[in-house]
Amino acid sequence: MTSSPELARAVAATLARHVTDVVICPGSRNSPLSLELIARDDIRVHTRIDERSAAFLALGLARSSKRHVAVVTTSGTAVANCAPAMIEAAYSHTPLIMVSADRPERLHGTGANQTIEQRGIFNVVDTDHVVDITDLNSISFARNVIHINVALDVPLVDVLPEVGDPVERVREVIEVDHGEVVLNLNERILVVAGDEAWEVPGLEDVPTIAEPSAPAPYHPVHPLAAQIFAHKEIKPEHIVVVGHPTLHRAVLSLLADVPVTVLTKTDTITGNPQAVGSRVKVTGELDKRWLQICEDASTLCADRVKEVLEGHGFTGLHVAAAVADTMAVGDTLFLGASNPVRDASLVGMPLGGVDIFAARGAAGIDGTVSQAVGVALDVQHRDATAIRADRTVALMGDVTFLHDVGGLLGARPENLTIVVANDDGCGIFETLEIGAPEFRPSFEQAFGTPHGVHIEAIAQAYGVNYLRAETLPELIEALIDTTDSAGFNIIEAVTTRSTRRDIDKALTL
């Protein structure tokens, strides 16, 4: 039978063939794995004390690098804490490996400490159960989300491991090819690009509604224009969906009323498309009148947003506009769920030359700080010779920030600015049905959830540089001040949510 140190050494060598970064958490049962990983020169090891944060850190690293990243934990509830990140990874097709240490079979069902049934704990992925070195040979890394459960018996460690032998790294291609579809450009075609979208050859000149995490299109169309396109006189005759759009109700409603072709490189196909592919062959020519209609509709909507911004006080929408205006080519942006990613879409994102990431798989707010840190760390590691790493900015709401404030703990990147749009609660609910006047008596307790937390005190407790902005000019100044200086910064933008419902109404065309 393989000893635990030998098995851990084999697991570490296997991981080294497929990953550059590993996040470890302190624990006894996973101690042989941690020691072997630290002993390797070909793996960057990050340490976090909270498994939930660790898994989201790994997810952020994976999003940015587009490579597998592993998180390694001890047994028991430590494993369960990785579930939210595993779910997001599965639904966003992000490569993530969860390595859980486990008790040997003889201890299961005996009431042994920190012993739960870990095989199959993540229903989004099957478990590769490893009890011997030979079990590693059957693990396929040609998939996005992987759970490796390693049974380790005592003695867990013997001597401090020597430096592991270098291995040849393998880069798996994890894509599904759905073939080619034919598109007739003589039709009024509109592209809707969501998360996981890519630049599709042949569609460069087609008008495109692009969500912030999609590539910046050559002919962008403002998302509010979907309301205009609902009129039958100018309704698109065909919509091409690239990736996974989720943000705007009007866009999703339009998709339900027009023939749709879906372009994807994954095995996930939603809706009821008339065709599915991964590449296109185009025929015909774009109608210049259709191009002009799309341009005019987009301009009308962009002007409406500017008009509304000028007519209302400092809100999260203003914060998103300030962030957009101060991003530069080469910067990276991570957008929190809920209002920030939608606000970013309304103020003109995506941006050319700026990498933009957002958690749009399961679209939860959890783990946002940790994911942003992971993205920034990957950006920082891209060029070890650079005097200063390219800047990463993260935009999120106050509740999202507080939900993952523990993500501030641990080794930090030196190139990250977190912008917190603080409206003292859950501003997105102001714009939904539950924010209507008849629900106000119960709104604050159940949905608004004001907290009154002093974010400056949090920054001080974690040793993070803090700036505060109560007006749009102050925010722009703070963003500019942090552009040319290395470090980890938190900018708190003190906003209001009292006008969000009025703003949403004003943006309904």
UniProtKB/Swiss-Prot annotation:
Cofactor details (free text): Binds 1 thiamine pyrophosphate per subunit.
Stretches that traverse the bilayer: none
Keyword Repeat: no
Reactions listed under catalytic activity: isochorismate + 2-oxoglutarate + H(+) = 5-enolpyruvoyl-6-hydroxy-2-succinyl-cyclohex-3-ene-1-carboxylate + CO2
Cofactors demanded by this protein: Mg(2+); Mn(2+); thiamine diphosphate
Domain of life: Bacteria
Pfam families, per the entry: TPP_enzyme_C, TPP_enzyme_N
Keywords, in A-Z order: Magnesium, Manganese, Menaquinone biosynthesis, Metal-binding, Thiamine pyrophosphate, Transferase
Record GO terms (molecular function): 2-succinyl-5-enolpyruvyl-6-hydroxy-3-cyclohexene-1-carboxylic-acid synthase activity; magnesium ion binding; manganese ion binding; thiamine pyrophosphate binding
Gene Ontology BP term (one): menaquinone biosynthetic process
CDD domains, per the entry: TPP_PYR_MenD, TPP_SHCHC_synthase
Record EC number: 2.2.1.9
UniProt pathway: Quinol/quinone metabolism; 1,4-dihydroxy-2-naphthoate biosynthesis; 1,4-dihydroxy-2-naphthoate from chorismate: step 2/7; Quinol/quinone metabolism; menaquinone biosynthesis
Oligomer status and interactors: Homodimer.
Family: Belongs to the TPP enzyme family. MenD subfamily.
Known function: Catalyzes the thiamine diphosphate-dependent decarboxylation of 2-oxoglutarate and the subsequent addition of the resulting succinic semialdehyde-thiamine pyrophosphate anion to isochorismate to yield 2-succinyl-5-enolpyruvyl-6-hydroxy-3-cyclohexene-1-carboxylate (SEPHCHC).
Name the record gives this protein: 2-succinyl-5-enolpyruvyl-6-hydroxy-3-cyclohexene-1-carboxylate synthase
Organism in which the protein naturally occurs: Corynebacterium diphtheriae (strain ATCC 700971 / NCTC 13129 / Biotype gravis)
Gene expressing this chain: menD
